[in-house]
A protein has these predicted regions:
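Flexible loop residues that form catalytic
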Residues: 30, 135, 145
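Catalytic His-Asp charge-relay segment
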Residues: 136-140
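Cysteine-nucleophile active-site neighborhood
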Residues: 19, 29-108, 150-165
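RNA-binding accessory domains that recognize and position tRNA/RNA substrates
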Residues: 1-22, 32, 147-149, 155-173
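N-terminal Rossmann-like NAD(P) cofactor-binding module of classical short-chain dehydrogenase/reductase
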Residues: 26
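Catalytic beta-strand/loop cores that center a nucleophilic Ser/Cys/Thr
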Residues: 93-135, 172-173
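Structured helix-beta-strand junction loops
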Residues: 1, 20, 51-52, 113, ...
Length: 173
């Protein structure tokens, strides 16, 4: 896809990230409780969302995005671990086979109105994907980079790249 990727620490401030002149932000996976990481990550993510940059989060990045947008997270009774987890794409109506490794989830109850649920687990109906209704900001709970099925989730990267190309045309930097 010919993307230039710059990796920064999760504690890098928004100003330093914006000085890199990104066309998009990828919120990666990682271990642990999203609320603990959120103490320093949420203010950074809020500033990046205000810049109207495309943002794509996976796993912990998905949970942090949810927290940033006003959702709550909780520890699951039974985490999702392994391959072959069926997830329904609520926009397209199809089922994707995913790989997962998480023990926390975004809570459905009292979800802010600016969040659209895009994906749902067929095992327990937990939220597997969200998007911000007004901006090119979205995330999934699972690992689309692992390609457990016949590239079931490659479209997520294509959507993100399309958003970054559109953003690059704005020549904001």
């Amino acid at each position: 896809y010919n993307c230039k990727v710059t990796v920064v620490s999760c504690k890098t401030n928004a100003g330093d990230i914006l000085n890199l002149k990104p066309n998009g932000i990828f919120l990666s996976n990682g271990p642990g409780d999203p609320a603990a990481t959120g103490k320093y990550a949420i203010p950074i993510i809020k500033k990046l969302i205000k810049m109207n940059l495309p943002i794509f989060g996976i796993c912990l990045g998905h949970q942090l995005l949810g927290l940033t947008l006003g959702a709550k997270t909780k520890k699951m009774n039974l985490g999702h671990r392994g391959a072959n987890h069926p997830v329904k794409n609520l926009i397209k109506g199809n089922v994707e086979i995913t790989s997962q490794n998480h023990g926390f989830e975004i809570v459905r109850k009292n979800l802010p109105k600016n969040i659209q649920i895009t994906h749902q687990s067929l095992f327990d109906n937990s939220i597997e994907g969200i998007k911000l209704k007004s901006k090119p900001v979205f995330s999934v709970q699972y690992h689309p980079e692992s390609n457990p099925g016949p590239q079931d989730s490659v479209y997520l990267f294509e959507e993100f790249i399309k958003s970054m190309k559109k953003n690059a045309k704005k020549k904001r930097y």
